[in-house]
C-alpha cells in the first residue's frame, strides 16, 4: 500500500511536466502491473478483506491518470469537451477493462510482439470519436511515431 501512495505522490507532481505520451505510457504500465488486481478482485477480497481499500486506491490512481490526460487534451484543443457531465469520468473508471481484456486476449493468442501497440490502438479507438479536427490531425501525424515509442518503451516488460 505504501508503494501506491509513493507512486501517486510522484505521479501527481510529475504529471504537471509530462507529455501526453508519457502520461499514457505510465498509465499503461500502471494498469499492466496491477491488472491481476482488477481481474481477480472478488477472489482476492474473499481471501484478504482489506484488499478492497487497496482496490479503491488503485482505481482512483488510474482515474487520475486518465482524467489528467483528458484534461490536458481538452486544454490543448485535441479533444472535445464532454457532451454531458461525467462522460469522461465513466471512461476513466473503466479503461482498465480495455487493457486487461486486451492483454489477456493477446497473451492467450501468444501475440506478445504487438500487444502494447494494440492496447494503444484500442484505447485511441475509444478516444477517437471525441477528438477534435486538431486532435485527429495530431493523432494521424503521430500514430506511427507513438507506435515505435511504445515498442521501444515496453520491450522489457
Task: Please annotate each region the language model reported.
Residues 7-37:
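Hydrophobic alpha-helical connector segments
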Amino acid at each position: 500500500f505504501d508503494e501506491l501512495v509513493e507512486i501517486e505522490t510522484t505521479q501527481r507532481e510529475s504529471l504537471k511536466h509530462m507529455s501526453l505520451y508519457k502520461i499514457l505510457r505510465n498509465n499503461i504500465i500502471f494498469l499492466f502491473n496491477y491488472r491481476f488486481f482488477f481481474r481477480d478482485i472478488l477472489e482476492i477480497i474473499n481471501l484478504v478483506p482489506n484488499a478492497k481499500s487497496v482496490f479503491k486506491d488503485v482505481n482512483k490512481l488510474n482515474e487520475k491518470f486518465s482524467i489528467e490526460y483528458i484534461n490536458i487534451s481538452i486544454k490543448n484543443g485535441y479533444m472535445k469537451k464532454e457532451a454531458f457531465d461525467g462522460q469522461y469520468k465513466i471512461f476513466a473508471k473503466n479503461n482498465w477493462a480495455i487493457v486487461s481484456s486486451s492483454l489477456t486476449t493477446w497473451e492467450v493468442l501468444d501475440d506478445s510482439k504487438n500487444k502494447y501497440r494494440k492496447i494503444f490502438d484500442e484505447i485511441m479507438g475509444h478516444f477517437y470519436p471525441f477528438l477534435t479536427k486538431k486532435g485527429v490531425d495530431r493523432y494521424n501525424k503521430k500514430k506511427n511515431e507513438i507506435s515505435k515509442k511504445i515498442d521501444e518503451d515496453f520491450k522489457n516488460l
